[in-house]
Amino acid sequence: AGSVKKYEGILNDSCETIRKSGNPAAMAAVTEYNVGTIIDSYREQTLEAAIFNAGMLNMFLRNTDKLAMCNLSDLVNGWPGGCIVSKDGHAFGTATYHVMSMYSGSRLKEVLDIDVFSPTYSTSEQIGNIEPLSGVPYVDGAACLDENGNTVIFALNRSCDQEAVLEIKYETPNKTVEKAEITTITSEKTSDMNTLPDESIVPAACMMQT
């Protein structure tokens, strides 16, 4: 999941180089990206993959000033981790499908600036094409306004053993929030995945008074 940090660095460096070359308004286009870093593996259907993809979506939102488009590769089947798995006339959504559904269903209108302060971790081994990383935040986030002017915050927790407690502060003076709708996707283990008879990794919503 920490590989998102590498991809965000590549995007920022690429756009900076292109814009310095004489086109300050140049935008990047992500023509295709996959739902995980290990291709042709059951892991593409797990909660682990959903955490990775939530991080990718947050990264894309934070960088909308640099991106003209972002396309996901193959929504249905196509490889073991297709977002929608179809077989013998039946279909179910992977954990990543439900994450994408949450984001797309939020009906976003505007991306807000956000600063996320979180403990970090480092990796010591190369995984696929991702070399060891340092300073990867456990908590990742993005903030937006929806069509009704409501603030929408997307937050993910990369820690496998620690819950994340979020403290949200607005820069707007006298900004108050009376209640919040919280929608979560989680499971006991990052290796958990949906199956045709048991699609249990789905969004769960509740209201909270502040």
Task: Report residues per predicted region.
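Short, well-ordered amphipathic alpha-helices
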Residues: 10-18, 56-57, 165-170, 182
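C-terminal beta-sandwich/jelly-roll accessory domains of carbohydrate-active enzymes
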Residues: 122-136, 156-210
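Secondary-structure transition/capping motifs at alpha-helix termini
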Residues: 16-26, 59-67, 106, 171-176
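C-terminal catalytic subdomain
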Residues: 87, 92, 103, 136-142, ...
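A structural signal for isolated positions on well-ordered beta-strands in alpha/beta enzyme cores
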Residues: 29, 152-154, 181
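Glycoside hydrolase catalytic-domain groove-lining segments
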Residues: 1-41
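Flexible loop/turn segments at secondary-structure boundaries
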Residues: 1-5, 35-40, 76-82, 122-123, ...
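Aromatic/acidic polysaccharide-binding cleft in carbohydrate-active enzymes
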Residues: 29-140
